[in-house]
């Protein structure tokens, strides 16, 4: 999209209409009212335009107290805590300050006459488009915007926030989108911008076609609704953003185990046989994601009322081997299904302007034997349709399914008419949010008792989807660039408030990965919050050769040992919004050295992971400030340096952070073998502790308020100290 500033009405503030305990409102030159509200120290909301239509419950917070003042020059200031938003007129300009330091302001790009080239706020005369623009300093990076597979630093990119079937990881198309961006700033503090809308948003982040010195955005909605954030560091911005849009929910322990994604054309009994082989070969796994037609067409299974009494033998076989079962679903209802006529008669389907069910069509199958399929989409904006679809899951859960995987294979057409009055152009992104929300509520209501917290797997999402974990990435091309892009998608999602993200090891796209690539992909995914393994055909671990199978077994065993640690990281996410896998710019924003190493990441607070992205096992590792212990050799390395690292195929570059501790469980075949109250087997302590460790009955690191921190552990916990053991006090618990 190109933007011509001449097409926009440049908004200016004429005068204040009034103030309140939480903000102020202003008359503008376009006749619209600009409403500014505080949502806590460091969070301000700016709304202008007609009364908003359906917002789909995205904002989960309320305005908070602020102080509003006017200077002698007529500028207004709204302040709360250490943050202040200044609003000036002639022309309209914003300044966001943190601790009296400027962190963000409206665009400073001027034309030859001295007039702003990009308005702070603008409205296209024909309506339906709004713009906003913010200044960028030279070298100022910008991150976020959801699941994007290119560079994490979005500076110089032109991107769209729009939910699409990504299909692969080679373009900017993605399923999980969030119109939320942030920057580490320029030593003054961090800032963030969130566009509150279900509509498409185009972002030009220092893009030269718009302005290399500005972050400009265009919103395809009837009103403009922005949040701006200020804080000390990016973690503070994520905290504010997830306060506003919702914290991630907890996940069940079994979801942290390996999920086996079976091929779409694999019969359920064949999936059961393959899963049995995982147990026989002692390769740890917890979930089997069945093909979409495991119970027949998902909608048809609802009509048939599948129940436990009718459960086939293959399902019983999986249950006997302690596997959790995942069923893929879409909200597509075939026109030939009896369910189509039932839902159409109740107006539970997205419709045309004339009120008839909107019929979508798609070719399916191999190109030579493709069949044309016609279907309609459930209208989740209709409260009764939402409840009907949610409750219809009862029979599927009763049949033995533990979780559903919501797959958005169809983009909502722009000319669809929804029950709530929205057209498809405004519903398309929210549809993924609503479908996932419906499936999550169904899981919470009907899942098997004792299965832990509810969860749902989803290939698509919008702002707010982080409340209903978890997101799953698309299949990637089976080469080294596919691995790198997969990691960037996971890390970009984490930088956008998505705390839990499942990357898929391997692919169903074309040829399988070579054994070396398969191993490196698996090793990297072990340290993400969730991981899936593409299987079926020639893609199961034992089919890569005995060496690859043995290494896969080793690292999956370590994955299961990490589960107590991962659970702690997810608990932190539910409180702060920090993802489990943290890109360098998020974890160490003050270190320019590590920022450009965009496929490195922290797994929680204690582990630095440096995935190997090429043949041969060599990688450059940028060690952040501090000191780091190589988990392979236990060697200690000073931080703030780039290390050339070589790893044999059964090794992987992972480093423990000095001053931190790593709680580890036993190696198990599935999470059902983990003792709920006594999960620990070992505690690895990286040098002299400087941080507490809490939450476990078997071990903890606590401050003694005199000499520092003391490690206490039960006798059945193996405490291992990396580095100088004499510097660490270990006492019985």
What residue spans do the PLM features occupy?
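Catalytic core of carbohydrate-active enzymes
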Residues: 440-446, 454-455, 461-472, 493-503, ...
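Short, well-ordered loop/turn elements at secondary-structure boundaries
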Residues: 30-31, 72-73, 79-81, 90, ...
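Generic recognition of flexible, low-complexity loop/linker segments
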Residues: 23, 33-34, 166-169, 177-179, ...
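Aromatic- and carboxylate-enriched substrate-binding clefts and catalytic-loop regions
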Residues: 51-53, 106, 121, 284-552, ...
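A non-catalytic, amphipathic alpha-helix used as a structural packing/dimerization or gating element
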Residues: 240, 273, 384, 388-392, ...
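N-terminal accessory segment at the very beginning of proteins
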Residues: 1-255, 259-276, 287-290, 304, ...
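Composition- and surface-driven signal marking solvent-exposed, interaction-prone regions
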Residues: 194-197, 206-208, 271-272, 290, ...
């Amino acid at each position: 999209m190109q933007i011509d500033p001449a097409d926009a009405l440049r908004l200016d503030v004429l005068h204040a209409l009034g103030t309140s305990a939480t903000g102020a409102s202003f008359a503008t030159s376009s006749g619209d009212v600009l409403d500014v509200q505080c949502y806590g120290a460091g969070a301000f909301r700016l709304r202008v335009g007609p009364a908003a239509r359906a917002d789909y419950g995205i904002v989960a917070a309320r305005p908070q107290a602020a102080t509003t003042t006017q200077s002698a020059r007529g500028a207004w200031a709204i302040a709360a805590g250490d943050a202040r938003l200044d609003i000036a007129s002639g022309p309209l300009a914003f300044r966001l300050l943190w601790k009296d330091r400027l962190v963000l302001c409206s665009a400073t790009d001027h034309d030859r006459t001295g007039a702003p080239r990009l308005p702070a706020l603008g409205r296209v005369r024909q309506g339906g488009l709004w713009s906003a623009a913010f200044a960028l300093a030279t070298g100022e990076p910008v991150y976020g915007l959801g699941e994007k597979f290119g560079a994490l630093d979005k500076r110089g990119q032109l991107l769209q926030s729009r939910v699409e079937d990504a299909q692969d990881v080679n373009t900017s198309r993605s399923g999980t989108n969030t119109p939320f961006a942030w920057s580490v700033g320029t030593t003054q503090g961090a800032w963030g911008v969130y566009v509150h809308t279900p509509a498409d948003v185009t972002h030009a982040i220092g893009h030269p076609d718009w302005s290399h010195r500005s972050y400009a955005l265009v919103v395809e909605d009837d009103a403009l609704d922005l949040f701006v954030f200020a804080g000390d560091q990016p973690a503070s911005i994520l905290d504010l953003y997830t306060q506003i849009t919702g914290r991630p929910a907890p996940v069940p322990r079994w979801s942290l185990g390996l999920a086996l994604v079976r091929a779409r054309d694999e019969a359920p009994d064949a999936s059961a046989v393959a899963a049995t082989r995982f147990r026989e070969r002692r390769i740890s796994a917890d979930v089997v994601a069945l093909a979409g037609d495991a119970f027949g067409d998902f909608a048809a299974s609802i009509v048939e009322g599948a129940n436990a009494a009718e459960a086939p033998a293959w399902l019983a076989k999986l249950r006997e081997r302690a596997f959790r079962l995942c069923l893929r679903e879409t909200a597509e209802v075939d026109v030939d299904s009896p369910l189509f006529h039932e839902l159409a008669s109740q107006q539970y389907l997205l419709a045309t302007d004339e009120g008839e069910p909107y019929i979508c069509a798609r070719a399916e199958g191999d190109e030579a034997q493709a069949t044309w399929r016609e279907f309609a989409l459930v209208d989740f904006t209709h409260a009764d349709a939402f409840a009907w679809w949610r409750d219809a899951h009862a029979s599927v859960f009763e049949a033995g399914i533990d979780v559903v995987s919501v797959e958005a294979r169809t983009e909502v057409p722009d000319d669809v008419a929804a029950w709530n009055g929205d057209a498809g152009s405004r519903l398309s992104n929210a549809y993924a949010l609503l479908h996932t929300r419906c499936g999550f509520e169904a899981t919470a209501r009907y899942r098997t008792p004792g299965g832990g917290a509810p969860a749902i797997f989803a290939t698509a999402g919008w702002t707010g989807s982080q409340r209903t974990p978890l997101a799953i990435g698309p299949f990637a091309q089976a080469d080294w660039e596919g691995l790198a892009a997969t990691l960037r998608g996971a890390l970009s999602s984490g930088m956008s408030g998505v705390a839990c993200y499942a990357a898929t090891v391997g692919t169903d796209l074309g040829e399988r990965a070579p054994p070396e690539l398969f191993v490196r992909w698996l090793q990297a995914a072990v340290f993400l919050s969730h991981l899936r393994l593409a299987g079926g055909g020639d893609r199961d671990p034992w089919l890569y050769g005995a060496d690859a199978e043995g290494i896969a077994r080793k690292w999956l065993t370590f994955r299961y040992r990490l589960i107590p640690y991962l659970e702690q990281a997810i608990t932190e996410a539910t409180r702060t919004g920090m993802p489990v896998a943290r890109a360098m710019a998020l974890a160490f924003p003050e270190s320019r050295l590590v920022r450009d190493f965009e496929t490195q990441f922290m797994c929680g607070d204690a582990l630095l992971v440096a995935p190997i992205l090429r043949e041969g096992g060599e990688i450059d590792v940028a060690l952040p400030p501090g000191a780091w212990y190589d988990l392979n050799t236990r060697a200690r390395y000073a931080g703030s340096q780039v290390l050339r690292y070589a790893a044999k195929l059964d090794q992987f570059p992972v480093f423990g952070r000095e001053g931190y501790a790593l709680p580890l469980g036993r190696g198990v075949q599935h999470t059902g073998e983990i003792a709920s109250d006594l999960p620990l087997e070992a505690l690895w302590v990286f040098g002299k502790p400087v941080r507490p460790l809490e939450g476990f009955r078997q071990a903890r690191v606590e401050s003694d308020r005199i000499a520092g921190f003391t490690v206490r552990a039960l006798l059945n916990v193996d405490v291992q100290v990396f580095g100088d053991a004499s510097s660490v006090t270990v006492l019985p618990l």
